[in-house]
């Protein structure tokens, strides 16, 4: 598979990658709204920002589950590639650094691509974005994950609804299964059926299991009803 590795010169992590001399695809657009579409899959490196400023290495898919948009289009999810994201995440989790390693729920753009896009991010401030040792370690682990994608074991292909934005549950499930879109609890009440269906259908690998994390009865019933046309196992947590 032709997997393109991408960075943006408008992003501090991208500038660090360029300084380190990696021969990846270079763009100058905002990472949340870029239009690069080459290859059969795209892995883009970028900064991660959070109010808590917790040092972190994260992976996630792009997509806007509601009308609220940060790049891309409203109520549109990107294409997930569970086997690839999980292979990368498993390698990141092996990094011997005292830094949080986690999967984030699907958020922000772009949503224009008809190939899967995976974000690999470093948080949460300039100290980490420009740290050449950390950036190099993350990039090299990502490359290992890409190299191992075809041998990645997936007990199930899982999409998720509920839980926090930084999901310990789905990060843990990735040890044995491969993870598609995760829609956090913050968006659940704003979802329409089309987005719920996209969370299953927009995937390179066929999703065979949905995990619903800590949602109330009304929220669970609505998601289950939207997925009634799918032959899929639903697990409540």
Curated annotation (Swiss-Prot):
User: Which cofactor does this sequence's record say it needs?
Assistant: Zn(2+)
User: Which cysteines form disulfides?
Assistant: none
Claim: Cell membrane is one of the keywords in the record: no
The family database entries (SUPFAM superfamilies) matched by this protein are listed as:
AF0625-like (SSF142535)
Query: According to the lineage, what is the superkingdom?
Result: Archaea
Pfam families for the chain? tRNA_deacylase (PF04414)
How is the cofactor bound, as the UniProt entry phrases it?
Binds 2 Zn(2+) ions per subunit.
InterPro entries, alphabetized: Deacylase_DtdA_archaea, DtdA
Q: Which UniProt keywords apply?
A: Hydrolase, Metal-binding, Zinc
Reaction(s) catalysed (UniProt annotation) = a D-aminoacyl-tRNA + H2O = a tRNA + a D-alpha-amino acid + H(+); glycyl-tRNA(Ala) + H2O = tRNA(Ala) + glycine + H(+)
Q: Which residues form a coiled coil?
A: none
| The enzyme's E.C. designation | 3.1.1.96
Q: Which GO terms describe its molecular function?
A: D-aminoacyl-tRNA deacylase activity; zinc ion binding
Class of this enzyme: hydrolase
So which residues are the signal peptide here? none
| Family (UniProt) | Belongs to the DtdA deacylase family.
Q: What does this protein do?
A: D-aminoacyl-tRNA deacylase with broad substrate specificity. By recycling D-aminoacyl-tRNA to D-amino acids and free tRNA molecules, this enzyme counteracts the toxicity associated with the formation of D-aminoacyl-tRNA entities in vivo.
Q: Tell me the NCBIfam families matching this sequence.
A: PRK03995.1-1
- Subunit text: Monomer.
Q: What is this protein called?
A: D-aminoacyl-tRNA deacylase
């Amino acid at each position: 598979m032709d997997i393109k590795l991408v960075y943006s010169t408008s992003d501090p992590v991208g500038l660090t990658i360029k300084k380190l001399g990696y021969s990846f695809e270079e763009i100058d657009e905002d990472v949340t709204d870029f239009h690069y579409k080459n290859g059969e899959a795209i892995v883009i490196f970028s900064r991660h920002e959070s109010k808590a400023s917790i040092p972190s290495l994260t992976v996630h898919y792009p997509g806007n589950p509601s009308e609220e948009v940060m790049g891309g289009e409203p109520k549109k999810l990107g294409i997930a590639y569970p086997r690839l994201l999980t292979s990368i995440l498993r390698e990141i989790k092996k990094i011997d650094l005292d830094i949080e390693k986690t999967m984030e729920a699907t958020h922000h753009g772009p949503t224009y691509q008809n190939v899967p896009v995976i974000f690999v991010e470093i948080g949460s401030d300039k100290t980490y974005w420009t740290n050449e040792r950390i950036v190099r370690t993350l990039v090299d682990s990502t490359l290992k994950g890409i190299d191992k994608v075809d041998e990645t074991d997936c007990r199930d292909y899982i999409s998720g609804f509920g839980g926090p934005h930084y999901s310990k549950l789905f990060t843990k499930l990735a040890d044995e299964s491969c993870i598609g879109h995760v829609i956090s609890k913050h968006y659940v009440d704003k979802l329409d059926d089309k987005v719920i269906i996209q969370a299953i259908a927009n995937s390179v690998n066929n999703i065979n299991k949905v995990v619903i994390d800590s949602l109330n009865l009304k929220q669970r019933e609505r998601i289950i009803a939207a997925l009634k046309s799918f032959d899929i196992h639903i697990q409540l947590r």
